């Protein structure tokens, strides 16, 4: 799917009451998907979600995608990448971008966070 066809994909407004709370791929957190294009199937090109990080945990791998994490609520999270980099995502609305295949571990600063997560395939 290219960006032009993605922009012409049918869409709909989803009420927040209809968001499904689902476990992360690795089972160590929660997410509420708010947009997926295309809307059906597992072969998406763009995905927007809000994650709840409740404990220090490894992040799920999403090879071939560009990820971003934007702090919406909470005292922040420290991301430790396998290559030694550390990114602190702190209030009010700290953010970080990274490749989906990067191995990383999140450490909560002080309590649960809610984070906005735009994720898209890098070939778009």
Locate predicted features.
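A short, N-terminal "cap"/entry segment at the start of jelly-roll beta-barrel domains
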Residues: 1-42, 59-64, 78-116
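Short, conserved beta-strand element in jelly-roll/cupin
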Residues: 68-76, 119
